[in-house]
Amino acid sequence: DFTNGKLYQTTTLPKGSYKLTVNFKEYGVKAGSSLYFAVAAGNEVPDVDDVESNSIAYHDFGTGENKTPSECVIEFEIKEDTQEVALGFVASFSANSWFRATGLKLELK
C-alpha cells in the first residue's frame, strides 16, 4: 500500500487552450484506491484528497479494471501570459492496484 504516490513533470506554458491525451495499456484500481491524472498550477501535483479542489483539470480513473489499450483526454486553459504547471499522476493504492501508461501528448489547440 502507498499514499499520495506521484509521478509528474513541471513546465511553463503560454496562454492558450490545451488538450492532453494520456494513453494506457491497462490499469486496475481496486476498492479503497484512487488514481488521478492532474494538471495543477505550480511545481507539484496535489495530494489525492486535494486533486479535485486544487487542479486546473484532472481525470479520475475511479475503481475498476481496463485491460485493453485506452486513452483519457483532458482539456484545459491557461489564462495568464505564462504559467508554471505540474502534469502527472497521483495515486493512493491498496494491494493489487496498478497502471501502465504508454504515452502522453500535450497539444496547444
What does each model-identified segment do?
Residues 45-82, 94:
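Extracellular carbohydrate recognition and processing domains
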Residues 5-35, 72-76, 104:
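Extra-cytoplasmic beta-strand recognition segments
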Residues 11, 21-62:
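Extracellular ligand-binding interfaces
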Residues 3-4, 66-68, 90-109:
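Extracellular carbohydrate recognition
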